[in-house]
């Protein structure tokens, strides 16, 4: 299996350079499958507080119009109130939406209650994952604390 390559579009500069990015992918026959629009970083680069902002939606629609043969996935602070944003983009060709840990293929027929359920499940999974990592790394940190004390005592003797 060939790895799937994605390109993050997460800044005002990336949006500005999208034509040259897409041309390079095409000219060099790069195995890029998808563009991933990161609304959080994109909105920060534009100094826009709300990722649901109309300007962010317009930028996303513009990127979808230029996508060529690539899929486009959207992420960045997805929550239940993101449904109208995702729904509007689904009608323009959005392939998928994602949280940091879960990706969902979209469709024009996606219903609000299904979307809310998917987002809640994804966020619950991510929260469980983070708590698991925190517990695991906390235990590792305790082991390292013991090793640090052992080495420090060796250096003193």
Name each model-derived stretch.
Residues 1-157:
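Expand to "…catalyze enediolate/carbanion chemistry for C-C bond making/breaking, isomerization
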